[in-house]
A protein has these predicted regions:
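Sec-dependent bacterial lipoprotein signal peptides
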Residues: 1-22
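Structured, soluble extracytoplasmic/luminal domains of envelope-associated proteins
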Residues: 85-110
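Envelope-exposed proteins and targeting segments
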Residues: 52-54, 68-70, 86, 126-133, ...
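Sec-exported extracytoplasmic/periplasmic mature domains
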Residues: 103-111, 195-203
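Short secondary-structure boundary motifs at beta->alpha junctions and helix caps
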Residues: 81-91, 157-196
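Surface-exposed short loop/turn segments
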Residues: 24-43, 108-157
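A structural "domain/chain start" motif
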Residues: 22-94, 201-206
């Protein structure tokens, strides 16, 4: 009798679990976003003397801990609070995305003279190294997106040649995709400033 009651209890519990499963919907797949790189056709010669064939290695790029998540972070501009959107994620680490866009932005501007920029993980010799420390990089749809970063340009042996701080904001579009697009444009503006600094460096010794 005891065995029968136990079997009935287990059967009832299993039925409840199966019934609950019928009403539970699986969590929706998150949307994935990637920081957009600049388009090559958007650039024209600016009349600045370029360093012929200059090679720049970008990295390390560091970000604050509050940004080091795959879920996209959105700031409430009124309450000055931030929140992670679990239904929207970066398709790569934010550090990798920032590095990629800066490399693309610099390469597009250095390419007319045969120059290029590449991540520090690439096994290539470089004339200069670019270190970037991101201090803030966030925003919200239909609100300002802010980028603040310290940077330094050094020789391959660590001698600091130039250093500075970039700080700018840009109004984002009404959707999350508009915020991501604004983040990409801010990085490209940052890349333009960095390239102007690179263009003032002495010719590299090889």
């Amino acid at each position: 009798m005891k065995i029968l009651r136990t079997a009935l209890a287990l059967t009832g519990a299993l039925a409840c679990i199966l019934l609950a499963g019928c009403f539970l919907k699986p969590a929706p797949e998150p949307d994935y976003y990637v920081l957009p790189s600049p388009e090559a056709q958007s650039y024209v010669a600016e009349g600045i003397t370029r360093l012929a064939g200059c090679r720049v290695v970008v990295g390390p790029v560091t970000i604050p801990g509050y940004l080091d998540h795959l879920p996209i972070l959105v700031r409430d501009p009124k309450a000055n609070t931030v929140a992670l959107k679990n239904d929207a994620r970066w398709s790569e680490s934010l550090t990798a995305g920032i590095t990629r866009v800066l490399c693309d932005s610099l390469t597009l501007r250095l390419a007319p003279s045969g120059g290029s920029a590449f991540p520090m993980e690439t096994a290539m010799n470089a004339d200069w190294r670019l270190f970037v420390n991101i201090m803030r990089f966030d925003g919200a749809p239909d609100a300002p997106v802010a980028l603040e970063a310290d940077w330094s340009l050094t020789t391959p042996y660590g001698e600091v040649l130039r250093h500075g701080r970039f700080k700018d904001t840009l109004k984002a579009g009404p959707e999350l995709s508009g915020m991501v697009a604004a983040m990409g444009r801010l990085l490209d503006t940052f890349g333009a400033q960095l390239e102007r600094e690179i263009s003032t460096l002495p010719a590299p010794r090889r």
